[in-house]
């Protein structure tokens, strides 16, 4: 089992800018926004990752805004 899992060629360097696919904000003022699901913890001060394969990382940082989604602009539908 080789540990070569570097498929980051087709997406713009994820490490260079913070992004978030699932962001949840509270209704308080100011809002408290958390990124619900991330594949890594690049722009995250406090991060919790599961031990599953692949690991799912939850960023527990709280901001008053949401980063833009990590997914690139094109729709990719997995419906088949």
UniProtKB/Swiss-Prot annotation:
Record key words, sorted: Calcium, Disulfide bond, Protease inhibitor, Serine protease inhibitor
Site (Reactive bond for chymotrypsin): 51-52
A GO MF term: serine-type endopeptidase inhibitor activity
A Pfam match: Bowman-Birk_leg
Cysteine disulfide links: 19-70, 20-35, 23-66, 25-33, 41-47, 44-59, 49-57
pH dependence of this protein's activity: Stable at acidic pHs. Inhibitory activity is unaffected after 1 hour at pH 3.0 and 96 degrees Celsius. Inactivated after 1 hour at pH 10.7 and 96 degrees Celsius.
GO CC, one annotated term: extracellular region
Site (Reactive bond for trypsin): 27-28
Purpose: Protease inhibitor with activity against cysteine, aspartic and serine proteases. Highest activity against serine proteases, in particular trypsin and trypsin-like proteases.
Protein name: Bowman-Birk type proteinase inhibitor
Organism this protein belongs to: Phaseolus acutifolius (Tepary bean)
